[in-house]
């Protein structure tokens, strides 16, 4: 299960060949995800996605994804960069941020 938030839809834009491979792999492995998105019409590579939208516009080139003990921070710019951190404590810390965002966005959407 992957969780994340930020500048979604950029993988297809900056790495279109890898995007096709990634999308196919996720479908074959039945990988699910909970993403907090900036735009409702962004292309998401995963098939089984639960998505909520931030209630305000956030201008960012950064995307954070967490999977198992891995945290990947993408910097989507002319030459994309990423930092991969393989550490369970770091992944759990980012997971806690995601839980807080997700809970508060659920509360906003119920009003």
Feature map (PLM): residue ranges:
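Signature of lipid phosphatidyltransferase scaffolds
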Residues: 82-111
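Hydrophobic protein-protein interaction segments
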Residues: 1-86, 90
């Amino acid at each position: 299960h992957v969780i994340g938030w930020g500048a979604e839809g950029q993988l297809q834009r900056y790495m279109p060949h890898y995007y096709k491979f990634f999308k196919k792999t996720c479908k074959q492995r039945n990988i699910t995800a909970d993403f907090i998105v900036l735009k409702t019409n962004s292309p998401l590579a995963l098939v089984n996605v639960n998505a909520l939208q931030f209630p305000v516009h956030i201008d960012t080139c950064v995307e954070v994804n967490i999977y198992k003990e891995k945290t990947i921070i993408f910097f989507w710019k002319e030459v994309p960069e990423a930092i991969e951190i393989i550490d369970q404590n770091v992944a759990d810390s980012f997971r806690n941020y995601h839980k807080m965002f997700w809970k508060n966005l659920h509360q906003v959407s119920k009003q």
